[in-house]
């Protein structure tokens, strides 16, 4: 409960996705849900400022070893099953992701982007959204060819 979080100087950790800040083709519903969660966390962080409760949003790229895709359901409500698509070469093993999250919690960070090199894409999107769109489109077309 919020009173307990306040008295213990607790932390709320939300694992969203890098797609919370960057649109990706063919992922419209997923991206919209992640944008919503990011906005909620950003607003809640400000509402809780000064209470001792911190909010950490984790924005990973691909995380391997979760079997998430295999257990997910598609738009028809049926299980998607294993994907034939390969993870990006920048995918992060789930154990490494957990260690990074724990480290960020210990530092009481507000945001953790994994892998860190994705910060460059976020900056590019601020400076030149068209250039960021081109990078994203190219990366997605490479993934779909695999």
Residue ranges and their predicted role:
Residues 22-28:
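Active-site loop immediately N-terminal to the catalytic Tyr-X3-Lys motif
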């Amino acid at each position: 409960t919020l009173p307990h979080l306040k008295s213990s100087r607790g932390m709320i950790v939300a694992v969203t996705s890098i797609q919370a800040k960057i649109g990706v083709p063919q992922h419209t519903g997923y991206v919209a849900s992640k944008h919503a969660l990011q906005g909620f966390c950003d607003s809640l962080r400000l509402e809780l400022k000064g209470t001792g409760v911190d909010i950490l949003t984790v924005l990973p790229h691909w995380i391997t070893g979760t079997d998430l895709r295999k257990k997910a359901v598609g738009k028809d409500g049926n299980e998607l099953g294993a994907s034939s698509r390969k993870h990006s070469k920048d995918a992060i093993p789930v154990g490494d992701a957990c260690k990074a999250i724990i480290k960020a919690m210990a530092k009481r960070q507000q945001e953790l982007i994994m892998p860190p090199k994705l910060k460059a894409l976020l900056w590019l999107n601020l400076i030149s959204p068209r250039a960021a769109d081109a990078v994203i489109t190219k990366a997605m077309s490479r993934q779909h060819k695999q």
